Every structure is written in structure tokens, then in C-alpha cells.
Amino acid sequence: MKINSPLEAYKYLPQTNCGECGEPTCMAFASKLIDRSGKTSDCPPLVKEKKYAKKLAELDRLLAPEIRQVTIGVGEKAANIGGDDVLYRHKLTFFNKTKMFFDVSDNMEEDALIERVKKIADFKKFYVGRNLLLDGVAIKATSNDPAKFAAAVKKVAEIGLPMIFCSFNPAVLKAGLEVAKDKNPLLYAANKDNWKEVGELALEYKVPVVVSVFNDLDGLKSLAKTFAEAGIKDIVLDPGTYPSGKGLKDTFTNFLKIRRAGIMGDTEIAYPIMALPLTAWMAGISDPVSASYWETVIASVFTIRYGDIMILHSLEPYAALPEMHLAETIYTDPRTPVSVDGGMYKVGEPDKDSPVFFTTNFALTYYTVESDISANGIVCWLLAVDTDGIGVEAAVAGGQLTSAKVKDAFEKAGFDLKTDTNHNTLIIPGLSARLQGDLEDTLGANVKVGPMDSGRIPGWVEKNWPPK
């Protein structure tokens, strides 16, 4: 992105405050463009009226991310990679979380192939209010047989996940494309030997393609430039992923050099980068658990340092879960704390005799409290107070959590302790104990201070509920 101020974007907008974009003013819409929560296409006059055509083209150019965004697959499950503007998250944020594709082989028996693909599609982990999922399937042409590869692609495509076609044989890639023309797969890969044929396939079928040159950044840049000049825009870079020793160090350095050059304005290499942690299985490690461990280490390194897409092998939870959790953490937007909607939530089927708790709407706090309560079979009411996504202790200290805020949260939820319960009692977090007196005055209720840690709620309830 070449501009970072709403004022700079504003001068390219119609400046009529028509409201067709859903914002009251063009300046408000400009702010959405800068934080990438809005698109130029959301402004109908800018798109439809010819007099704004030049402004639209220039604004699109200025708003384009430094690293090109590439889409793999189609529909709701399509995987977007790249699209970043900064080297360090705290300067803005990272966009498009690292995508994790898991391998299958066209040599697998049909039942085993379908079982593994379904396992990839069904793998999920509930984490801080959302389900973490795997992103796609990388189909390896181990047989080097076009017909066999096409048959495997056809089976995998039925599941609906984005796909990577893995072969250096253009005939094999073409066979896969013929049975998945409308699936927008990523081709892996074009190298110094097959670049012309693979490039022609990418142009003919309008699909993204990986350019692969191991440990030679000049060669990689040259090949990417050749493809771009031929009209291929959706390019992914593979500088090689060595699994150990000096090779791994060189790989790490190459990723840094590529991303730094792209962010600093070298458009010839400003593309998403592919990492291949599954090379850990080629490092001579005989024990599968140890190989999975090392694959996870490599995946972690390149999640933190600019790997936009990865091909992995191990689907064991002890390998996949750390990879998924790390990616989710690194790609959390630091500008906006992860939060849940404020309001009154039911844990189980509470009635008028059930206890009433409150916590803040910081997602990690809320789901920890909710989990500790529900896992121990406690039926209750749980109020999430909107503190702008800040945890209890920090919100009390910063003034985001006050007795007035709690009262307002009860009113917005339409919940009255006097009429909706038989006990008129509120249990508050131990870290907000200083609010007890104010809350009793503000709510006209009996306020009890709960434990400092939600894990102790079951023991506290056993000793202190119902109130005497």
C-alpha cells in the first residue's frame, strides 16, 4: 500500500457523501480503505461513473498491497495468500494467515486416498471462539502418470478443498487441469527446465503457479520476472526448503531477503512465498514421531518468518495443532483485540435460582471462564461486559470496566437481577474486587467476590452457593 492516511485516499473519492457505500461520509469510507476493511468496489459512483475512472485506477494502484495477493481454489473455501504491507506486525498487521496444505499421493489406494482427504477436510479445533481448520490438499504425482494423477485429482476435487498439483512434468499437470478446470488449483512447479510449458499451462487455464529455483534468488527473481512479462500475475515463490544444517539457515535467510525486497518496493519479487516443511521427512529421520516434531519446528520457523503457504505431511494432532495455534496467534490483528459480543449468555439451561457471573468480552477471558464453568456442570448466567476486548484486570485499571459499565451491560441485555433471579446476587471476578461496593450501590444487589482464577469457580460455588 503506497498511502497510509485517509486524507490521501479521500482525494480520489467522489467526495459527495452519498452514503451508498454504507458510510455517512467519504472520509469515513476512506478510513475503511486504509485499514483494508473496505474495497473501492464498495463505492458505486466511483466504479460506475466514467468521470471517476482515472481516479479509481490510481486509487487501486495506491491501495494495492506491497506483496501480491494470490487466491487458490474457489468459493467460500478459497485460500488467499500474500497481501502484506509490512515486515513487522506491530507496524500495521499481517493479512491472510499462513495456509497449510497436507499431502496425498496419486499412488495411494482409492480408499486410503479418500480417507486421508476427508481427514484433512474434517480436521478442526475450537479455539477462542472459532474453529481452526486445515486449508487444502497437495496432490503429489508420485507415479508420474498423467492418467493416474487425473484420477486422483478427480477424487480429491469432490471434497471441495483448494488444491496444489505437485509435479515437474507438464503433461501430468495438464491432465490434472483437464479434470479440475474450474477449481483454480495452484501448479507446483515451474523450474529452469520446464518453465515454458508450465507457464503456458498457467496462461491457458488461468491458474496460479509456483516458480521454483532452489537457493538461487537471482535465478528465482529472473524466472518470476519472465512469467510476469508473459502476463502471468498470480505467482508464488519457492526458494527451496532445506530441512537441516546450513541448508536450513540459507532457507531462512532467503525468506528474509525475498520479503524485505518485496516490501521495500522490488515488484519483480513481491509475491507470496511457499515453504515445504514436509522435507523434514527427507532428512534421514527414521522415527515418525521425531520426523513430525521436526516438521512442526520448520513450519513454526516459517510461519513466523514470511511463509505464506506450506505443504506438510503429518496429520497427527501433536504436529498439526501447534502449527495451527501458532499461525492463529501470529496473524491476530494487534489493532483489534479478539472479542465476543457483549451480552448475557446461558451456560446450560439456567433458571431464576441459577448463579449470575460476569466477565469481560475479551475472547480468551470469556471462553476460558465459560469452559471452566460448563466443564464442571455449573448451570448459570454469564454476562460479557463490553470492555473493547480487554481482560478483567487491565480493564479495571484502565477504566474500561466500571460499575456503570456493568449496569449498562445488564440493561442492554434486558436482564434485571431483582426480577429475573430469586436471589438478587451477582458474582464478580476476584480481579475486580475493588468494584464490589460501587456495584452494590449501582445495582442494588448483593455482590459476592469470586475467585481470582476461573478454574477455582467450581470449588467456590460448592462452598458459597446458594447464598445464605
UniProtKB/Swiss-Prot annotation:
Record's cofactor remark: Binds 1 [4Fe-4S] cluster.
Sequence ranges assigned to domain 4Fe-4S in this UniProt record: 1-61
E.C. code: 2.1.1.245
Keywords for this protein: 4Fe-4S, Cobalt, Iron, Iron-sulfur, Metal-binding, Methanogenesis, Methyltransferase, Transferase
Keyword Iron-sulfur found: yes
GO BP term, example: methylation
Domain of life: Archaea
InterPro entries: 4Fe-4S_dom, Ac-CoA_synth_d_su_TIM-brl, ACDS_complex_subunit, AcylCoA_decarb/synth_gsu, AcylCoA_decarb/synth_gsu_arc, Dihydropteroate_synth-like_sf
Record-linked PROSITE patterns: 4FE4S
Protein residues bound to [4Fe-4S] cluster: 18, 21, 26, 43
Gene Ontology MF: a single term: methyltransferase activity
Annotated PANTHER family: ACETYL-COA DECARBONYLASE_SYNTHASE COMPLEX SUBUNIT GAMMA (PTHR36214:SF3), PTHR36214
Subunit (UniProt): Heterodimer of delta and gamma chains. The ACDS complex is made up of alpha, epsilon, beta, gamma and delta chains with a probable stoichiometry of (alpha(2)epsilon(2))(4)-beta(8)-(gamma(1)delta(1))(8).
Function: Part of a complex that catalyzes the reversible cleavage of acetyl-CoA, allowing growth on acetate as sole source of carbon and energy.
Protein name: Acetyl-CoA decarbonylase/synthase complex subunit gamma 1
Gene field: cdhE1
